[in-house]
Amino acid sequence: MSSGALLPKPQMHDPLSKRLWVHIVGAFIVDLGVAAAHKFGAAKPRKKAYADFYRNHDPMKDFDEMRKAGVFRSVK
């Protein structure tokens, strides 16, 4: 038996494309994770905060408070 038969041959054909494929798949998985984290960690809470604010918001009350504080000169 020769030592050449025991060692596996190195792959010489297209090693770059296999490496790129692994990195492309990895980048896609990371991208999906970041998108999900942004949606559930930032976008949904912000949307809920805006909805809660406008659900309980009374613009006439704010206007009357600003008018009484003297913010508007033309409104008496």
Swiss-Prot record:
Tell me the superkingdom of the source.
Eukaryota
Q: What's any one GO cellular component for it?
A: mitochondrial inner membrane
Q: Where in the cell is it found?
A: Mitochondrion inner membrane
Q: Which InterPro entries match?
A: Cytochrome_c_oxidase_VIc, Cytochrome_c_oxidase_VIc/VIIs, Cytochrome_c_oxidase_VIc_sf
The UniProt transmembrane annotation reads 15-55
- Assigned keywords, A-Z: Membrane, Mitochondrion, Mitochondrion inner membrane, Transmembrane, Transmembrane helix
Q: Spell out which residues lie on the membrane's Mitochondrial intermembrane side.
A: 56-76
Sorted alphabetically, which CDD domains does this protein's record hold?
Answer: CcO_VIc
**What family name appears in the similarity comment?**
Belongs to the cytochrome c oxidase subunit 6c family.
What the protein does? Component of the cytochrome c oxidase, the last enzyme in the mitochondrial electron transport chain which drives oxidative phosphorylation. The respiratory chain contains 3 multisubunit complexes succinate dehydrogenase (complex II, CII), ubiquinol-cytochrome c oxidoreductase (cytochrome b-c1 complex, complex III, CIII) and cytochrome c oxidase (complex IV, CIV), that cooperate to transfer electrons derived from NADH and succinate to molecular oxygen, creating an electrochemical gradient over the inner membrane that drives transmembrane transport and the ATP synthase.
State what protein this is by name.
Answer: Cytochrome c oxidase subunit 6C-1
